[in-house]
Curated annotation (Swiss-Prot):
Keywords: Cytoplasm, Ribonucleoprotein, Ribosomal protein
GO terms under biological process: translation
Localization terms from the record: Cytoplasm
Protein name listed in UniProt: Small ribosomal subunit protein uS19u
GO MF assignments: mRNA binding; structural constituent of ribosome
Species, as recorded: Arabidopsis thaliana (Mouse-ear cress)
Family annotation (InterPro entries): Ribosomal_uS19, Ribosomal_uS19_CS, Ribosomal_uS19_euk/arc, Ribosomal_uS19_SF
Gene name of the encoded protein: RPS15A
């Protein structure tokens, strides 16, 4: 077995790369795109099922309309123009895959390219709204023992 591999490598035959085909809860991407909203909602978690059962308002539908327009106007093989939005609570659905969305984080619009792995998540999960804490040295008065630490 070990002596077979060097012969294959020496022959100059490139090893084919196999890519994992995406599936959401056992359903492949093509089937997700063809699925009706009712069937799609059954695959989502309970929190998102509840959100869909309470109905979609005008705002998320307007965003999807803008995304469709951006995809339609994009040249073949090019990425669509980014669509800016404040709708951080928008749930990512299969129709949005391939779009670029500028998600507002309270200060700027973070551009997020929608990938198949993001289905069923909120847009806010991909645009962090706070700056993570970088802990430095403790200041004076942080602990009782800090009274004995000389000031610089």
């Amino acid at each position: 077995m070990a002596d077979v591999e060097p012969e294959v490598a020496a022959a100059g035959v490139p090893k084919k790369r196999t890519f994992k085909k995406f599936a959401f809860k056992g359903v492949d991407l093509d089937a997700l795109l063809d699925m009706s909203t009712d069937d799609l909602v059954k695959l989502f978690s309970s929190r998102i099922r509840r959100r869909f059962s309470r109905g979609l308002t005008r705002k998320p539908m307007a965003l999807i309309k803008k995304l469709r327009k951006a995809k339609r106007e994009a040249p073949q093989g090019e990425k669509p123009e980014p669509v800016r939005t404040h709708l951080r609570n928008m749930i990512i659905v299969p129709e949005m895959i391939g779009s670029i969305i500028g998600v507002y984080n309270g200060k700027t619009f973070n551009q997020v390219e929608i990938k198949p792995e993001m289905i069923g998540h909120y847009l806010a999960e991909f645009s962090i709204s706070y700056k993570p804490v970088k802990h430095g040295r403790p200041g004076v008065g942080a602990t009782h023992s800090s009274r004995f630490i000389p000031l610089k």
